[in-house]
Regions:
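A domain-level signal for caspase-like cysteine endopeptidase catalytic cores
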Residues: 1-95
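Active-site-proximal C-terminal subdomain of hydrolase catalytic domains
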Residues: 124-194
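Extracytoplasmic/periplasmic, Sec-exported soluble proteins
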Residues: 3-10, 41, 101-111, 118, ...
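Cysteine protease catalytic core and zymogen-processing segment of caspase-like enzymes
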Residues: 58-151
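Proteins with a high burden of low-complexity, intrinsically disordered sequence enriched in S/T/G/P/A and R
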Residues: 1-5, 16, 44, 117-122, ...
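Extended aliphatic helical segments
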Residues: 25, 33-35, 53, 60, ...
């Protein structure tokens, strides 16, 4: 979401919360979130992954019709090009246009992780902070098959404020209180509903 919708305050708050509970935080700026970054994501060994990236469970057909996709696409910061012909031709990669930009960027679909990613998630908790992160469960299922403990996200499109608002209460509840990730999700939900 840094692409067109940055939120430095969220990054600072999340970093402070995580570091205060012993986590070592690695922030990856959007321009470094590439196809290769996603390919190596399971093998990085991260306990907690906050994917604050554009995402969608829909695609546009050649005729211009918007239809449900078979999985969620996660946007990269890598401009669309002729690179990765094998992955493009097999439908593992697509193009993604974000609001406020006229440039297309690569997006990775669920099957990319199933067929082209390296390594396994070490019981990671993955939070997909973009739109529709759980609208179609296939990508989350693939993450679980690759060793993730849990995948948390939204079912629909939303504004960045609504997507960012529950993240800090979730981290606070999960890391400091401490609650299970399921309890922390409920706490975060209550915090934004009140």
């Amino acid at each position: 979401l840094s692409l067109g919708m940055p939120n430095l305050a969220f990054i600072e708050t999340a970093t402070r919360l995580l570091e205060s509970t012993g986590y070592r935080v690695t922030y990856i700026p959007q321009q470094d979130v590439t196809v290769e970054f996603y390919r190596r994501l399971p093998a990085r060994g991260d306990d907690l992954i906050l994917l604050r990236v554009h995402s969608s469970g829909r695609l546009v057909t050649k005729s211009g019709t918007v239809v449900d996709d078979s999985s969620i696409s996660l946007c990269t910061g890598e401009p669309l090009s002729k690179a990765y012909p094998k992955e493009r031709n097999s439908g593992q990669l697509g193009g993604f246009e974000t609001l406020g930009t006229e440039q297309l960027f690569f997006s990775v679909r669920g099957e990319f992780f199933a067929r082209s990613a390296s390594g396994k998630f070490p019981q990671s908790v993955i939070v997909i902070m973009g739109c529709e992160g759980l609208r179609i469960p296939r990508t989350a299922e693939i993450f679980l098959d690759l060793g993730a403990q849990a995948v948390i996200g939204w079912n629909d499109q939303s504004s960045t404020h609504v997507m960012d608002a529950p993240a800090a209460p979730f981290l606070e509840a999960w890391l400091r209180q401490p609650q299970t990730w399921k309890e922390a999700v409920a706490t975060a939900r209550r915090s934004v509903e009140s």
